[in-house]
């Protein structure tokens, strides 16, 4: 049996996952992170995108986070997300529409234009679509 570490994935609204995992994979601001049991203690911020957990036995579950923090301690990994959902619960049509609306806002700058807000909405929609695409590649279109 492979070694495992306890993992919690929580958002401001709820705890989405709590259990033993063999590995956690997330997108940090300096690149991808792969956390295995025995990893050195770490605290880092996370970019919007997928967080993958490989559970005991090798099954994998994918979550989308809108950003947050990753804390690693000797016996646990904790993902503290601003917003988090199971990747299978993402609405692809809504993410595409949000991306189009943000792109339109960026191209039609008006007097009340907030570039930072429009860019953040575009980045979040793009991260959701990347998560959906990664899940499709990994699971062949099946939701997990």
UniProtKB/Swiss-Prot annotation:
Disulfides per UniProt: none
Keyword tags: ATP synthesis, Cell inner membrane, Cell membrane, CF(1), Hydrogen ion transport, Ion transport, Membrane, Transport
Cellular location(s): Cell inner membrane
Main location: membrane
MF term (GO), any: ATP binding
Domain of life the protein comes from: Bacteria
Pfam families: ATP-synt_DE, ATP-synt_DE_N
InterPro entries listed in its UniProt record: ATP_F1_dsu/esu_C_sf (IPR036794), ATP_synth_F1_dsu/esu (IPR001469), ATP_synth_F1_dsu/esu_N (IPR020546), ATP_synth_F1_esu_C (IPR020547), ATPsynth_dsu/esu_N (IPR036771)
CDD domains from the UniProt entry: F1-ATPase_delta
Membrane topology annotation: Peripheral membrane protein
GO cellular component, one term: proton-transporting ATP synthase complex
Subunit structure: F-type ATPases have 2 components, CF(1) - the catalytic core - and CF(0) - the membrane proton channel. CF(1) has five subunits: alpha(3), beta(3), gamma(1), delta(1), epsilon(1). CF(0) has three main subunits: a, b and c.
Similarity section: Belongs to the ATPase epsilon chain family.
Purpose of the protein: Produces ATP from ADP in the presence of a proton gradient across the membrane.
Protein name: ATP synthase epsilon chain
